[in-house]
């Protein structure tokens, strides 16, 4: 489940990173808030920097706990975060920008924990293969995320459509939902076997 969860995680992460700049431009135009390209770039840079600490915190939080359960809960929390972020687009530029920061942190929260879960849940003799598969599934998810957002934007009104941005961020959240549901499925399957 950690490998499939990582695919959902990178789908969401790379989709978010691909489209955050144009999203902030849309929001500033929609709410008539004048911001420079430098402000947007610095905001995105700060999101990335703060994301490092979110990932470290998430990995540290899992120590001594049921990692799979915690990561599943993080996925559900991130899915809710995507919904709240999408809703914030209807209210104000500054609220939406704040929610983009929060959502970014929620996306990255489980990053280290997913990789650690892949490493520790298996035998030492197949660790290299598991990590290779982990990376391949992760990059596949990452390759799909950006185009999915673009597809949603193109088919629901374009980059100037409020509805299109709302739906695109809901679609981003599906990465975390798939991750969380993958873990829930494995929990259910494990309980049936015992």
Task: Report the location of each language-model feature.
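A late C-terminal transmembrane helix in Major Facilitator Superfamily
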Residues: 122-158
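Intracellular helix-loop hinge segments at the cytoplasmic ends of transmembrane helices
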Residues: 22, 113-121
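C-terminal transmembrane helical hairpin of 12-TM major facilitator-type secondary transporters
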Residues: 66-114
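Extracytoplasmic gate region of multi-pass secondary transporters
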Residues: 1-52, 145-146
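Multi-pass alpha-helical transporter architecture, strongest
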Residues: 86-89, 115, 158, 165-194
């Amino acid at each position: 489940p950690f490998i499939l969860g990582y695919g959902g995680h990178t789908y969401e992460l790379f989709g978010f990173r691909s489209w955050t700049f144009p999203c902030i431009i849309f929001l500033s135009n929609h709410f008539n808030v004048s911001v420079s390209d430098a402000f947007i770039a610095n905001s995105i840079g700060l999101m990335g920097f703060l994301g490092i600490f979110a990932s470290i915190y998430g990995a540290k939080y899992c120590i001594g706990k049921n990692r799979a359960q915690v990561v599943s809960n993080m996925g559900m929390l991130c899915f809710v975060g995507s919904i709240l972020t999408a809703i914030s687009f209807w209210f104000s530029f500054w609220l939406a920008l704040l929610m983009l920061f929060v959502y970014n942190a929620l996306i990255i929260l489980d990053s280290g924990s997913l990789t650690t879960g892949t490493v520790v849940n298996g035998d030492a003799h197949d660790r290299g293969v598991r990590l290779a598969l982990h990376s391949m599934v992760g990059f596949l998810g990452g390759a799909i995320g950006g185009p999915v957002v673009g597809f949603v934007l193109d088919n629901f009104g374009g980059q100037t459509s409020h509805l299109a941005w709302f739906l695109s961020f809901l679609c981003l959240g599906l990465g975390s939902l798939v991750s969380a549901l993958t873990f829930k499925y494995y929990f259910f399957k494990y309980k049936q076997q015992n």
